Amino acid sequence: MFTYDIHAVYVKRQIYLRLSIEANSFIDAISEFFKKNKECINGVLDIYCKRPKSGDLALMAHYDGITYFYEGTRQTKYFLSTKDGGKYVWNGERFIMDDES
């Protein structure tokens, strides 16, 4: 397990959130962050993580949602795009790989 020092900027509300989380991976840490900060699920966030050696903050991911209509129903899908090109989708419990990307 690793300790992830997560820093998030809730873009539209201009709120800064910080949380240290122990997890096996960055995606697990971000999933835990969203479970503890449910108000962020409908937001737009820039997510930073503190580098272990230097202590500098590095932009690690961007979180946003898209709204679309499917069979006459309005739906929103929330995406996490990581700096290494990974695309994840929030399934209501955690982030999973987006099979459509």
Briefly describe each language-model feature range.
Residues M1-Y16:
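Short aromatic-glycine-(Arg/Gly/Cys) micro-motifs in beta-strand/loop hairpins
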Residues N24-G43:
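A short, charged, amphipathic alpha-helix used as a generic interaction element across diverse proteins
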Residues Q14, A29-S31, D98:
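Residues in flexible loops and secondary-structure boundaries
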Residues I6, F26, F33, T76-K77:
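Generic hydrophobic/packing signal
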Residues K38-S101:
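Short, mixed-charge low-complexity intrinsically disordered segments
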Residues Q14-S25:
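A short, exposed loop/beta-hairpin motif centered on an aromatic-Gly-Thr core
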